[in-house]
């Protein structure tokens, strides 16, 4: 039995967007979907009940962070990540590849794996593709990721080619090591930087390995937006129609819409929770920096069109006060709103695909979103 089952329900008439159903051991997910990030087995400032209330059906955990603290064996003893954090819906864990390359110092990459030092205490560790699968098997997440090397931007062709070759070798080894196939679906990750021939080669070779789903990695790392969209558009052409496609680390409202139009089904990003803690919120009329002075006497909600708990009960002036006073509730209320905003945006996107009016929806949404920009 496969761990997941994916079905395309409807294709948009004028774009590559798809409406789908993804069945997992912990529930059914309607796609396209945005997945809140719970790096350390918690979506920062939110309880699982609040996430359910806002409509989250799948969240992320992070292999690198959970391996270092509290340790995957402790989580396994607790009965797995779902039990440990009291979340009974789906979980996807990323492989830790990105964190090893971005957070840890003194890393040494060999064909066998990566030696790195913990960003917490400087202790030395070694990740191999097999080790990363073993950790994720202990965590018990529904969808797990291959260990990959995420090349920086910009990077020269030869470096990215070597990195892509390594990603493919590691994917093969990880797939061989993965034993829990009836309960955990392992996705391959397409790398190749901004070089189309490398993206194509990586996608085709991973598709030959027949993974139950495919991720597009190595984007949103500093490249221009137009180039990112071009690479997404190009890459999805080489991925199977009957498997889910996951764009890693991308999650601004405009990026979600553009990604869906180019055939992506799943997204995650720390941005909505991170900017919320700094006093920035998404609204239907663009980003709003609620801690700024103009809102000191603004008693309207963050977004007149939003019916989340925060917008129904509190004003911009109150949120500004909480941020200025450094109250914990500030982060909670702003985070709730931002996640709710993106989850509802995905609902609207799915409805637009249903009605074959995604391009019209994009135009209406962006016209309003960019019409009153505060960035």
Curated annotation (Swiss-Prot):
Belongs to the queuine tRNA-ribosyltransferase family. Its EC number is 2.4.2.29. Disulfide bonds: none annotated. Residues 249-255, 273-277 are annotated as: RNA binding. GO terms for molecular function: metal ion binding; tRNA-guanosine(34) queuine transglycosylase activity. Substrate binds at residues 94-98, 148, 191, 218. The gene is tgt. It catalyses: 7-aminomethyl-7-carbaguanine + guanosine(34) in tRNA = 7-aminomethyl-7-carbaguanosine(34) in tRNA + guanine. Pathway: tRNA modification; tRNA-queuosine biosynthesis. Pfam families: TGT. Homodimer. Within each dimer, one monomer is responsible for RNA recognition and catalysis, while the other monomer binds to the replacement base PreQ1. One of its GO terms (cellular component) is cytosol. The keyword Cell wall biogenesis/degradation does not apply. Binds 1 zinc ion per subunit. This is Queuine tRNA-ribosyltransferase. Its cofactor is Zn(2+). Keywords: Glycosyltransferase, Metal-binding, Queuosine biosynthesis, Transferase, tRNA processing, Zinc. The keyword Transferase applies.
């Amino acid at each position: 039995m496969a761990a997941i089952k994916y079905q395309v329900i409807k294709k948009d008439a004028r774009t590559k967007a798809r409406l789908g159903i993804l069945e997992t051991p912990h529930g059914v997910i309607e796609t396209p979907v945005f997945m809140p990030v719970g790096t350390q087995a918690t979506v920062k400032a939110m309880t699982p009940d609040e996430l359910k209330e806002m409509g989250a059906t799948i969240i992320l955990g992070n292999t690198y962070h959970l391996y270092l603290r509290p340790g995957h064996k402790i989580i396994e003893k607790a009965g797995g990540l779902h039990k440990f954090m009291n979340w009974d819906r789906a979980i996807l864990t990323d492989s830790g590849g990105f964190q090893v390359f971005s957070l840890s110092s003194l890393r040494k990459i060999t064909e066998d794996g990566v030696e790195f030092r913990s960003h917490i205490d400087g202790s030395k560790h070694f990740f191999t593709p097999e080790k990363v699968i073993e950790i994720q098997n202990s965590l018990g997440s529904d969808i797990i990721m291959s260990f990959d090397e995420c090349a920086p931007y910009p990077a020269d062709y030869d470096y990215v080619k070597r990195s892509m070759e390594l990603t493919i070798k590691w994917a093969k080894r990880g797939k061989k090591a993965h034993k829990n196939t009836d309960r955990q679906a392992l996705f391959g990750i397409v790398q190749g930087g901004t070089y189309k021939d490398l993206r194509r080669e990586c996608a085709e070779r991973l598709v030959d390995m027949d993974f139950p789903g495919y991720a597009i990695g190595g984007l949103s790392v500093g490249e221009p937006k137009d180039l990112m969209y071009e690479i997404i558009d190009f890459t999805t052409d080489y991925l199977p129609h009957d498997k889910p496609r996951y764009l890693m680390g991308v999650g601004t409202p405009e990026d979600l819409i553009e990604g869906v139009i180019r055939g992506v089904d799943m997204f995650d990003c720390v941005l909505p929770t991170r900017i919320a803690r700094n006093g920035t919120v998404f609204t239907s009329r663009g980003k709003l920096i609620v801690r700024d002075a103009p809102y000191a006497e603004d008693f309207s909600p963050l977004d007149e069109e939003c019916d989340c708990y925060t917008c129904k009960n509190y004003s911009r002036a109150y949120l500004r006060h909480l941020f200025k006073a450094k109250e914990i509730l500030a982060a909670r209320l702003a985070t709730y709103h931002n996640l709710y905003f993106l989850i509802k945006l995905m609902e609207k996107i799915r409805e637009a695909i249903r009605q074959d009016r995604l391009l019209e929806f994009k135009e209406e949404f962006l016209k309003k979103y960019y019409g009153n920009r505060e960035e």
